[in-house]
C-alpha cells in the first residue's frame, strides 16, 4: 500500500466517523437519566448546591432531588419567612421529598439560660417551641433538634 493512499483513506475515514459522532450528540443532549435515589436518607441543606442551582431554594431542592436526595435539613428554618416555609413544604411534597431535622433555637444558646430556672428564659424557650410546631406543620417536619443552651456548671 502506498503511503499517500493510506493517508487519504485514513483522513476520509476519520472525517466520516467524526461527522457521524457529531450528528448523534444533539440527539442525546436533552436527555439525562435521573440519578437513582440514595439507599440511605441523606439530607443536604440549602447552600450546598448554590453554584449548581443558582436560582434559589426551589431550584436547589429540584437539583437535590435530581441528584438522588430524598430529604432536606435546614438549621435556619425558624428564621425563614412563612411564605418561604410554605414554598419549601409544597416543593418537598411535589418532589416526593421530606423535611429532615431543623433546629429549635431559643436564641440564648451561647449562654447559660434555660438551666438557670429563670422564668424569662423559660418563656422564650416555650414560645420558640410553640412557633416550631407551626413551622413543622408548614414544612411537614417530624423531627427537630432542640438546643436549650448551656447548662449551669455550678450545679
Describe each region flagged by the PLM.
Residues 147-149:
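Short, well-ordered beta-to-alpha junction loops that form the rim of enzyme active sites
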Residues 2-137, 141-143:
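N-terminal pre-domain/capping segments
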Residues 154-155:
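Active-site cleft segment of glycoside hydrolase catalytic domains centered on the general acid/base Glu
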Amino acid at each position: 500500500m502506498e503511503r499517500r493512499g493510506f493517508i487519504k483513506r485514513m483522513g476520509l475515514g476519520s472525517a466520516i466517523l467524526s461527522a457521524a459522532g457529531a450528528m448523534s450528540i444533539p440527539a442525546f443532549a436533552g436527555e439525562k437519566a435521573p440519578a437513582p435515589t440514595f439507599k440511605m436518607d441523606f439530607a443536604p441543606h440549602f447552600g450546598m448546591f448554590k453554584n449548581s442551582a443558582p436560582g434559589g431554594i426551589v431550584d436547589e431542592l429540584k437539583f437535590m432531588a435530581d441528584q438522588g436526595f430524598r430529604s432536606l435539613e435546614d438549621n435556619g428554618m425558624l428564621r425563614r419567612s412563612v411564605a418561604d416555609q410554605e414554598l419549601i413544604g409544597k416543593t418537598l411534597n411535589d418532589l416526593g421529598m421530606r423535611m429532615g431535622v431543623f433546629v429549635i433555637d431559643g436564641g440564648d444558646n451561647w449562654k447559660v439560660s434555660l438551666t438557670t430556672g429563670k422564668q424569662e428564659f423559660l418563656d422564650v424557650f416555650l414560645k420558640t417551641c410553640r412557633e416550631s410546631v407551626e413551622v413543622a406543620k408548614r414544612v411537614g417536619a417530624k423531627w427537630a433538634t432542640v438546643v436549650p443552651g448551656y447548662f449551669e456548671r455550678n450545679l
